Amino acid sequence: MRNVLLIFLTVSLAVICCFSPGLAAEKAEPVRHIVIFKYSSDASEEQIQKVTDAFLSLRKKIPGITGFETGVNNSSLGKNYGFTHVYLMTFKDEAARDAYLPHPEHEKFRELLRNSPIFEESFVVDWVPHE
């Protein structure tokens, strides 16, 4: 009987630890960070590619970036309002995204955009993906 009680208490404690938010370690969730750029109408593909390459280089310079995809709008709906180039980053978790934002390499990239004659504007959306 004593062994049964000991097993019951052990299992109960394990269940409480696994399902109590205060006791169990919280699972780090990835964060998606989408940036969409509008370039000037006279921007050449070479100029845009230089900006894209500089942006892509951040994944090797800043820890916590686990994925980086780029693409060009190909929607036939005509509702992109001049925004054409999409950059989708995945961060390990919110802490990685929060460390990325003020990172010196990210600041250098932002300075490159501010000084670029082809960059017009961007917008950014971050989210934690759920099914």
Placement of each model-derived feature along the sequence:
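Glycine-rich beta-strand-turn "strand-cap" elements at beta-sheet edges
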Residues: 4-9, 25-28, 70-81, 111-131
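Bacterial N-terminal signal peptides
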Residues: 7-18
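Sec/Tat signal peptide C-region and signal peptidase I cleavage site
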Residues: 20-24
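Short, well-ordered beta-strand segments in beta-rich or mixed alpha/beta enzyme
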Residues: 30-39, 70, 74-101
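Extracytoplasmic/secreted envelope proteins and their assembly/folding machinery
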Residues: 32, 48, 52-55, 94, ...
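An amphipathic, aromatic/His-enriched active-site/gating alpha helix that lines ligand/cofactor pockets
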Residues: 60-65, 81, 90-125
